């Protein structure tokens, strides 16, 4: 028996576990809810908590798929988007857009484009090295990631401390507070592509 087969979990089992954890978590937290909900409590659960839970699950699945595709593409189980500079490139792009006073759509696009640029730069540096191996690609990713991380730190240093710096920090930390069913559908369509 292969070790891989021992830990195989079906999508149905995963969905069942996620639903169980999500529903059991409804009554936990700062505000405990009774098994029967008032209309206000039902609204909080359905309109606020459920979109956040679904968003977290969707983003977790997307990050997992991104990591698995990176590992397959580079044939290296240690490779991940953050190791190849994609994460720090995306952070730099978002921070730069916030510093320039861009809209939410431009911030998102800048983050995406700089993430792609970081991976492209990592690939270019890795291919130009004498080693031409996966190790060279990983080392190039660490180098590019450090470069973009330093750039993000510089942007945070020169940003306005009253508005821009908190916005940059909040963006880099991430949040599910603005989750909605419409955004989940948009995210599903983008991940499907």
Where would I find each of the regions flagged by the language model?
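Alpha-helical transmembrane segments in inner-membrane proteins
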Residues: 4-191
């Amino acid at each position: 028996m292969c070790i891989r087969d021992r830990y195989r979990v079906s999508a149905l089992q995963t969905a069942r576990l996620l639903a169980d954890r999500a529903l059991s978590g409804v009554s936990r937290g700062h505000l405990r809810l009774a098994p029967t909900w008032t209309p206000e409590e039902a609204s909080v659960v359905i309109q606020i908590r459920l979109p956040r839970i679904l968003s977290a699950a969707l983003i977790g699945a997307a990050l997992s798929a991104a990591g698995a595709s990176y590992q397959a593409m580079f044939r290296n189980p240690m490779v991940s988007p953050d190791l190849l500079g994609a994460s720090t490139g995306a952070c730099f792009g978002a921070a730069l857009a916030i510093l320039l006073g861009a809209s939410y759509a431009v911030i998102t696009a800048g983050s995406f484009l700089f993430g792609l640029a970081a991976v492209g730069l990592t690939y270019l540096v890795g291919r130009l090295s004498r080693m031409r191996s996966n190790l060279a690609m990983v080392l190039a990713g660490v180098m590019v990631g450090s470069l973009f991380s330093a750039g993000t730190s510089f942007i945070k240093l020169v940003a306005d401390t009253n508005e821009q710096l908190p916005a940059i920090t909040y963006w880099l930390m991430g949040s599910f507070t603005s989750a909605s069913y419409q955004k989940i559908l948009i995210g599903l369509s983008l991940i499907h592509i």
